[in-house]
């Protein structure tokens, strides 16, 4: 490679991924009711904003505003609104044609009062580019609905009613009839008691010149109360076409009675079902106190239609009938706005046409949410043709209260137009339905239903052609009231179904968490390609976020899923103005209103509309190259001495800046910043920039479109050990948040999909000789540092000295692998003293698994990445030796040296070494205190025998089982005289013990025993016992007893009075396999000494005779001495006479004594 160049499109926008400018939006504001409720981009340069709640004049609400993007000002659009368009809320819905030549503005709340009812039909204006009204749809204000009613009075004429009350009842009938003058209502009247009389029929009422005079001649019948019979007569006779009843008219029966039926042959159960079947709506008026009881009240409920609270009236007397006259009238009028059991009486009276709209060249689509009792649908108004109503009536689906047409959108597939309608209240979860035209009739093609009650799924729709090929790819369906614990609202991404497959939604878009009442998805719009990736982007409004301040989300188009699942930008109202409310309640995008070649987004808020511009998009290409293309060996190789910084070469960085967006901004001077880093991620970089003397460098420049290059000098400040991996140069590029000199100071962003990090590499020249092929020649040896035998259990560590060398060219990735038995485990590695002119070895060892469970392996990397030619080194690997290890009698350790480029079939690269193995044990034999230790005997006992015993205990204190033998030596014969008749008592019968007679070592026992009065196997014949233990277990304990009769006659032969009888015990094992722990060898042997002592017999007569003669001689000597001293010559008699009678005093030279006067007995 002579020149390395890598190209990168790198990106890190000033606000990463943001494409809409929030620094300087254009804000339109008007003090008009509902301003910002709707907005649409129109004509490529202006916005049309609806203010549907503005009161323009009496009975006229709604106004449109023309807002110019260039000036930021709005002007009311002057329109001539016909007087009958009462309170239509003009501007609640807006739609513009794709070519910008027509605008459709609707007021779906247009009111029309018909009698006591107020109807809401809706009306729309189709406007041209100069605000001229091209068409009004519907073309005329609809007439009040024509409702026919046939009303029958069935009045009680029984005798319980006096004449005055009967006349008041007649006046009530006349008043009610007068309330329906001017309507298509016919009356008939029948009086009942036990007699029945029809006073006038519908035919008579229609033909009578004075309809009021029909009541005056009525005379009370008197009699009983046959109410059930009277109702049956009305049902079968009066509501009959022969009496003028009309088939199309509503049938109403008003029953007026003062009490319960009496002696009537019929029951209500006989007649009420017939009235129900005939579709007669019945009102019951009870007069008087007879209806205070529960039975009477129940009779009124039975007469009336359900529910009773809407069809039963009670008054205290006939004079009070006038108080219910207006209520009855309202109830009857309300029949026109209710639905019966059989069908919906509402058709299009409450349709609210224009609640949603779509504008095409083929006509106008107006959503009619109120049609057919709010089942909903849509009207298509083709040019110069009658309108077509589109709904679900042919699908046999209950759509009552579904609001079909709440939202309207068009979808195109290969030139075929499809209509998509939202029904957010369908079965309380919501639905979206696709209609297509088949044989000039619009039929359902597909539908998808919401999943959560109350979510309002289908409240908003958006048709998206992601790849701009002219066919709709997917439909976005908003469910703004979808509730989750931390967010509110979601938008389903539903690909347009192909063929007859079931319509399904593949993904869901959500706003940020923390906004459970955010109403995400309340408004949707196609934004256009704002990030210049050839895919259409969308915007979604969430006007309820942050306590109804609102926010708008931007989602980019994606080639695979259609729409990216995560938003690229969230614009909170607080970023624009602290006083905004419901920001995002209306959206409109897809046009360039500011004439800069960039798409703009209009966002409606309460009382304001904001125009957000998209930002210009730049593409930045980065190329990096090095000269020379490799770092020379002469630059990076060194030994002990530290080199001064040497030049590694030059790095040239080139930036190519070009525009991605097709804007009208000309040459863009943008402020850019790029950060360079050498060897990022390493603790110490191998190279630095000459300019900064460290591995990082930052540049910030203002650059225009084109190519911009800069050359930087690189230095190597230190010896380089790792010359295998190249020096990495990272470049991080970003645009600085500074406005460009353009209208309103737009800030450019980088193209989406670009990266923000560029990497280039500078390799090192390899030391491969003239042939260009690098081949190492490794060798390795092992030694155990003079250790002759490994004693397991005693040697806790094993040090292995490893020597490795390279006799070839540079070796890359040199590894020494050690293979050893599983009883060893790698502990540490340490380097030996380094050789002159060589740096210390860099070692890193790790244990690696092997397939053989009895074998372990360690890998030690040596001087990674390069073990240079001629290098050698020695290091010590220390292993822990498990005290439980079983290594056999010899341990084998193998070593192999390898690398990425080592010479093949080199015998020096492998080495193996064996070491003898023994196993440390700790066995102990000890004498027991229970043994016989002392005997004394007399000469007379020489022929007697006494039992004696020596006890020994053997313990295994090792960590392993082993086979041992215990030998005992006991003296049994001295010079042919029996000493001890001993036998062995082993701890178990299964333990074999054998005995053997051993002669003495010295025949001259007298000489030996005179030196040491000890009887042992050196002078006596001994009996040797050997007990073999094939498996002496860990912590096992064995007791042995030497027991037998001891003789004393042999002691005379020793010429000694006191002799020690000694037995000896000793443990033996295979010393080629086992070794007693160092310092514990003495515990393998023990001896027991038993003292024998002869008692001496003495003659006492000579002693006694000698003692007696000596005593007599002593007595004679004492007597003679006393005599010479005059002891026997003292005058006791005179001394007694000289004393008083009661006292005797003895005097002498040496003492005196006074005797007390003691009375004599």
From Swiss-Prot:
Disulfide bonds: 67-74, 106-124, 654-709, 768-774, 845-860, 993-1017, 1022-1027
Positions occupied by motif GFFKR motif: 1126-1130
SMART domains tied to this protein: Int_alpha, VWA
InterPro entries recorded: FG-GAP (IPR013517), Int_alpha_beta-p (IPR013519), Integrin_alpha (IPR000413), Integrin_alpha_C_CS (IPR018184), Integrin_alpha_Ig-like_1 (IPR013649), Integrin_alpha_Ig-like_2 (IPR048285), Integrin_alpha_N (IPR028994), Integrin_dom_sf (IPR032695)
Keyword field: Calcium, Cell adhesion, Disulfide bond, Glycoprotein, Integrin, Magnesium, Membrane, Metal-binding, Receptor, Repeat, Signal, Transmembrane, Transmembrane helix
Membrane topology: Single-pass type I membrane protein
GO biological process: cell adhesion mediated by integrin; cell-cell adhesion; heterotypic cell-cell adhesion; immune response; integrin-mediated signaling pathway
UniProt feature coiled coil, ranges: none
CDD domains: vWA_integrins_alpha_subunit
Location of this chain's protein in the cell: Membrane
Glycosylation sites recorded in the entry for this protein: 59, 87, 99, 391, 690, 732, 872, 956, 1045
Quaternary structure annotation from Swiss-Prot or TrEMBL: Heterodimer of an alpha and a beta subunit. Alpha-D associates with beta-2.
PANTHER family per record: INTEGRIN ALPHA, INTEGRIN ALPHA-D
Family listed: Belongs to the integrin alpha chain family.
Domain-level remarks: The integrin I-domain (insert) is a VWFA domain. Integrins with I-domains do not undergo protease cleavage.
Descriptive protein name: Integrin alpha-D
Organism expressing this protein natively: Homo sapiens (Human)
């Amino acid at each position: 490679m002579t020149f390395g160049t890598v190209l990168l499109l790198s990106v890190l926008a000033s606000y990463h991924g943001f494409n809409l400018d929030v620094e300087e939006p254009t804000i339109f504001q008007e003090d008009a009711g509902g301003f910002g409720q709707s907005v649409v981009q129109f004509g490529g340069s202006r916005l049309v904003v609806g203010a549907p709640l503005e009161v323009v004049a009496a009975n006229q609400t709604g106004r449109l505003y023309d807002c110019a993007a260039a000036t930021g000002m709005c002007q009311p659009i002057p329109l001539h609104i016909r007087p009958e368009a009462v309170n239509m809320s003009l501007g609640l819905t807006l739609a513009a044609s794709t070519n910008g030549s027509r605008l459709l503005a609707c007021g779906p709340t247009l009111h029309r009062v018909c009698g006591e009812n107020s109807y809401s039909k809706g009306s729309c204006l189709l406007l041209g580019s100069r605000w001229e009204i091209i068409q009004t749809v519907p073309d005329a204000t609809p007439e009040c609905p024509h409702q026919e009613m046939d009303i029958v009075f069935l009045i009680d004429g029984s005798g319980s009613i006096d004449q005055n009350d009967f006349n008041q009842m007649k006046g009530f009938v006349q008043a009610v009839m007068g309330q329906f003058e001017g309507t298509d209502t016919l009356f008939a009247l029948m009086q009942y008691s036990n007699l029945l009389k029809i006073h006038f029929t519908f035919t008579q009422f229609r033909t009578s010149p004075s309809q009021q005079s029909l009541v005056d001649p009525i005379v009370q019948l008197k009699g009983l109360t046959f109410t059930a019979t009277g109702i049956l007569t009305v049902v079968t006779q009066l509501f009959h076409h022969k009496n003028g009843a009309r088939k199309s008219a509503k049938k109403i029966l008003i029953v007026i009675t003062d009490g319960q039926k009496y002696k009537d042959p019929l029951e209500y159960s006989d007649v009420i079902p017939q009235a129900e079947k005939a579709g007669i709506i019945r009102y019951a008026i009870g007069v008087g106190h007879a209806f205070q009881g529960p039975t009477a009240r129940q009779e009124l409920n039975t007469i009336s239609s359900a529910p009773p609270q809407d069809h039963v009236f009670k008054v205290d007397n006939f004079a009070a009938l006038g108080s219910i006259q207006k209520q009855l009238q309202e109830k009857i009028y309300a029949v026109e706005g209710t639905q019966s059991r059989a069908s919906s009486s509402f058709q299009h009276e409450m349709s609210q046409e224009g609640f949603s709209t779509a504008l095409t060249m083929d006509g106008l689509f107006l959503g009619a949410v109120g049609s057919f009792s709010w089942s909903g649908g849509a009207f298509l108004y083709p040019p110069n043709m009658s309108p077509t109503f589109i709904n679900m009536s042919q699908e046999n689906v209950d759509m009552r209260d579904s609001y079909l047409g709440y939202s309207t959108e068009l979808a195109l597939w290969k030139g075929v137009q499809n209509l998509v309608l939202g029904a957010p209240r369908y079965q309380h979860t919501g639905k979206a339905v696709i209609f297509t035209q088949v044989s000039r009739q619009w039929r359902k093609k597909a539908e998808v239903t919401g999943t959560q009650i109350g979510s309002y799924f289908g409240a908003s729709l958006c048709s998206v052609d992601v790849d701009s090929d002219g066919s709709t790819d997917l439909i976005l369906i908003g469910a703004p009231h979808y509730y989750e614990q931390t967010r509110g609202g979601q938008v389903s991404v539903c690909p347009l179904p192909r063929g007859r497959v079931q319509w399904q939604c593949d993904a869901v878009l959500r706003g940020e968490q923390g906004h459970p009442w955010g109403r995400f998805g309340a408004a949707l719009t196609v934004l256009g390609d704002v990030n210049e990736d050839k895919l259409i982007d969308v915007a979604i409004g969430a006007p309820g976020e942050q306590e109804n301040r609102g926010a708008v989300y931007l989602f980019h188009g994606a080639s695979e899923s259609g729409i990216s699942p995560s938003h690229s930008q969230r614009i909170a109202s607080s970023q624009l103005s602290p006083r905004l409310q419901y920001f995002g309640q209306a959206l409109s995008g897809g046009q360039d209103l500011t004439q800069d070649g960039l798409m703009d987004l209009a966002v409606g808020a309460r009382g304001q509309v904001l125009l957000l511009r998209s930002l210009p998009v730049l593409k930045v290409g980065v190329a990096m190259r090095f000269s020379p293309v490799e770092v020379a060996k002469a630059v990076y190789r060194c030994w002990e001495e530290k080199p001064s910084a040497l030049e590694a070469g030059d790095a040239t960085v080139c930036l190519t800046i070009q525009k991605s967006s097709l804007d009208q901004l000309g040459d863009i001077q943008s402020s850019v910043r790029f950060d360079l880093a050498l060897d990022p991620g390493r603790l110490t970089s191998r190279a630095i920039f000459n300019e900064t003397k460290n591995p990082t460098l930052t540049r910030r420049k203002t650059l225009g479109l084109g190519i911009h290059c800069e050359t930087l000098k690189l230095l190597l400040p230190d010896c380089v050990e790792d010359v295998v991996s190249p020096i990495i140069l990272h470049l991080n590029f970003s645009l600085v948040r500074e406005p460009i000199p353009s209208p309103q100071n737009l800030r450019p962003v980088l193209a989406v999909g670009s990266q923000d990090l560029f990497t280039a590499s500078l390799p090192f020249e390899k030391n491969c000789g003239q042939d260009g092929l690098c081949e190492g020649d490794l060798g390795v040896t092992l030694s155990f540092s003079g250790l002759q035998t490994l004693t397991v259990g005693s040697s806790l560590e094993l040090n292995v000295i490893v020597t490795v060398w390279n006799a070839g060219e540079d070796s890359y990735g040199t590894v020494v692998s050690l293979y050893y038995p599983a009883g060893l485990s790698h502990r540490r590695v340490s380097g030996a003293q380094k050789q002159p002119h060589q740096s210390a070895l860099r070692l890193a060892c790790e244990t690696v698994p092997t397939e053989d469970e009895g074998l372990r392996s360690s890998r030690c990397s040596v001087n990674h990445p390069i073990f240079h030619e001629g290098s050698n080194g020695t290091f010590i690997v220390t292993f822990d030796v498990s005290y439980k290890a079983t290594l056999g009698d010899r341990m084998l350790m193998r070593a192999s040296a390898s690398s990425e480029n080592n010479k093949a079939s080199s015998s020096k690269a492998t080495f193996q070494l064996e070491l003898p193995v023994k196993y440390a044990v700790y066995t102990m034999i000890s004498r027991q205190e229970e043994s016989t230790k002392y005997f004394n005997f007399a000469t007379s006992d020489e022929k007697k025998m006494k039992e004696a015993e020596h006890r020994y205990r053997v313990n295994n204190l090792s960590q392993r089982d082993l086979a041992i033998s215990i030998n005992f030596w006991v003296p049994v014969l001295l010079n042919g005289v029996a000493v001890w008749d001993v036998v062995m008592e082993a701890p178990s019968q299964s333990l074999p013990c054998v005995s053997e007679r051993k002669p003495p070592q010295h025949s001259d026992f007298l000489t030996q025993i005179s030196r040491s009065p000890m009887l042992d196997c050196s002078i006596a014949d001994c009996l040797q016992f050997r007990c073999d233990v094939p498996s002496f277990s860990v912590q096992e304990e064995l007791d042995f007893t030497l027991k037998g009769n001891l003789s004393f006659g042999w002691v005379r032969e020793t010429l000694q009075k006191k002799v020690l009888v000694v037995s000896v015990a000793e443990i033996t094992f295979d010393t080629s396999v086992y070794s007693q722990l160092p310092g514990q060898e003495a515990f393998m042997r023990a001896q027991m000494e038993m003292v024998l002592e002869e008692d001496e017999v003495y003659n006492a007569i000579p002693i006694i005779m000698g003692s007696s003669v000596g005593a007599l001689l002593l007595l004679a000597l004492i007597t003679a001495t006393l005599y010479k001293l005059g002891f026997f010559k003292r005058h006791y008699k005179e001394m007694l006479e000289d004393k008083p009678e009661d006292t005797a005093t003895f005097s002498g030279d040496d003492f005196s004594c006074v005797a007390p006067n003691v009375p004599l007995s």
